[in-house]
Curated annotation (Swiss-Prot):
Gene: rbsA1
Annotated catalysed reactions: D-ribose(out) + ATP + H2O = D-ribose(in) + ADP + phosphate + H(+)
Domain of life (superkingdom): Bacteria
Keyword Repressor: no
Complexes and interactors: The complex is composed of an ATP-binding protein (RbsA), two transmembrane proteins (RbsC) and a solute-binding protein (RbsB).
Keyword Nucleotide-binding attached: yes
EC numbers: 7.5.2.7
Topology in membrane: Peripheral membrane protein
InterPro entries, A to Z: AAA+_ATPase, ABC_carbohydrate_import_ATPase, ABC_transporter-like_ATP-bd, ABC_transporter-like_CS, P-loop_NTPase
Stated name of the protein: Ribose import ATP-binding protein RbsA 1
CDD domains xrefs: ABC_Carb_Monos_I, ABC_Carb_Monos_II
GO cellular component, as recorded: plasma membrane
GO molecular function: ABC-type D-ribose transporter activity; ATP binding; ATP hydrolysis activity
Amino acid sequence: MRPLLEMRGITKRFPGVVALDGVDFELLPGEVHVLLGENGAGKSTLIKILSGAYRPDGGEILMDGRPVEIRSAAEARRLGISTIYQEFNLVPQLTVAENIHLGRQPRRFGVVDRGAMERAARELLERLGIRVDPRARVADLGVARRQMVEIAKALGLRARVLIMDEPTAALSEREVRQLFRIVRRLKEEGVGVVFISHHLEEVAEIGERVTVLRDGRLVGRVSADAGRDELVRMMVGRSIEEQFPRRRTEPGEVLLEVRGLGRRGVLRDVSLRVRAGEIVGVAGLVGAGRTELARAIFGLDPADSGEVLVEGRPLEAPGPQEARRRGVGFVTEDRQGQGIVPPLSVAENLALASLERYLRGRVLVDRGRLLRRAREIVQSLRIRTPSLEQEIRYLSGGNQQKAVIGRWMLAGSRVLIMDEPTRGVDVGAKVEIYELMNRLTEEGAGILMISSEMPEVLGMSDRVLVMSGGRITGELPAEEATQERVMGLATAGSEAAVG
């Protein structure tokens, strides 16, 4: 069978970096070809070349056996190439229907036909099994539903080649099943899918072949049913003996206590404790209230009732500034939207939460001392960046995430609320983040970890709190926590209204 898409000897250089070095890739009609590699391996550069964001410095691209040049995103779309990026490409102020049809709205007598646009959007959403009102503003949707709208938008373009960059990162298990059903339907129609994922368990389930990149080079191409150990070895160049290297420490004093926290419509009478030296995991289905709990504790979304205590004392004026001042840090689930400031440098992003700690007098920042400490953090966390002055937007997702965590280390936080700490992070970087979490707890910090990845919750938590319907439905010590028990608690009372 002739390939639908071929990339031969693709090379791309940036100042001081060879991002791609003679990489080959091919995609057959109706094939799901999985692209694997650590952050910084070259995956993002490869798909940006295919989507028209970058132009290669060498090599050629063929569609249906004919050479093509992809000079822009519009040209990629004209060739039938559509990309769903890991970070959202939606306009929050517009409705779901407007985002799905952006740039190609149906018109009648020269005017946008909103009825036709909303009907078409509704049909597409129903095809995907997404329960979202096409008239809803994207800004009012959670991360999972925004991701599904992004997928609907791309599929609405009727692409022949669909590039999916971490499409399942923000989805629940049920939503992943829905997505996979749609992908299989696209395969039957002859659409080729380039599927990028860090979830190795998805590879054999959805893919036919796997191409692995490392440090900008092609490591090899294997069948999707290759074992996990082989794939990990190809990705990182070494074996990972233990994916979740949790080192248990003896819990100390209570650092964070939440008493009867409530917020109308999302949280109901939530109480919990986090001690020094422990990781408390929070599990639950999408919509259970986990992120809302994290934001309420940190003061981003004020609670209607209850209180938050840090080291035994209530927060005097609940809010992010007070929480930060008292030693609480927050790693958001939305890295691009709320975690980093893309135009600022790595050093500036690291310093965002701790400038007052480096003041000389009342106004001037001791830049030398701050940069020395920031450099220590970068080296300690192995953040791959040409310099501290590099704009953080040019770092890979994994290095950006390590910088967000490093920000709170620089601030000296003793309590860390981590919402999806390894979302969009590759296997090797995940282990580095887990080791960092171990180090923080060994140094006396307490971590409240919210995660949609069940193996992560079970593998890294000392205790697991399970949420459903805005309340905590159960608590399990690590030795008693199983996927079955967690899921049982996660579905308990999920239909109950939150008061």
